[in-house]
Amino acid sequence: MVRYSLDPENPTKSCKSRGSNLRVHFKNTRETAQAIKGMHIRKATKYLKDVTLQKQCVPFRRYNGGVGRCAQAKQWGWTQGRWPKKSAEFLLHMLKNAESNAELKGLDVDSLVIEHIQVNKAPKMRRRTYRAHGRINPYMSSPCHIEMILTEKEQIVPKPEEEVAQKKKISQKKLKKQKLMARE
């Protein structure tokens, strides 16, 4: 079994998915992965489908040299964005795989959240292109490894009002006074 870079806090309530040596650009995939990190699984799936249809963009925050500006990036508080279709499709496949893993484990698929997603560089694949005057230049591809961990989100239960009212702070002086009154 392959080791993940992060162990889930509660392994019984989480599921994993990974892909190795995927023929998709590392930089585009990294930016797309950062955009869906922490999202609910249904929201992430809808977002990635919208990216392929160019209805929502992926904000390019780190690898943004020469990336043009787009109005859709304003939703993310950013100016530069693109629509990396292939990266979105690969991540959609990974989410689908993680979802089926969750069903197999018996988890509630509708409450899954992307807790951890990581994109690493894979060994480059080498090709060549022919240039003027008999020269040859490299024509490399930048594949990547992707891993993700999805976790069932617990519902936050509000505390009863009685307990909240009881926890009022009392100074040491008042506490001693109350004890003295109780003795008498």
UniProtKB/Swiss-Prot annotation:
Expressed in pancreas, lung, colon, cystic duct, gall bladder, kidney and liver. Expressed at high levels in the well differentiated pancreatic tumor cell lines HPAF, COLO 357 and Capan-1, the moderately differentiated pancreatic tumor cell lines T3M-4, AsPc-1 and BxPc-3, the poorly differentiated pancreatic tumor cell line MIA PaCa-2, and the pancreatic tumor cell lines of undefined differentiation status such as SW979. Expressed at lower levels in the poorly differentiated pancreatic tumor cell lines HCG-25 and PANC-1. One of its GO terms (biological process) is translation. InterPro entries: Ribosomal_uL22, Ribosomal_uL22_CS, Ribosomal_uL22_euk/arc, Ribosomal_uL22_sf. The keyword Ribonucleoprotein applies. SUPFAM superfamilies: Ribosomal protein L22. Gene3D superfamilies: Ribosomal protein L22/L17. Pfam families: Ribosomal_L22. It is found in: Cytoplasm. Component of the large ribosomal subunit. Component of the large ribosomal subunit. The ribosome is a large ribonucleoprotein complex responsible for the synthesis of proteins in the cell. Belongs to the universal ribosomal protein uL22 family. This is Large ribosomal subunit protein uL22.
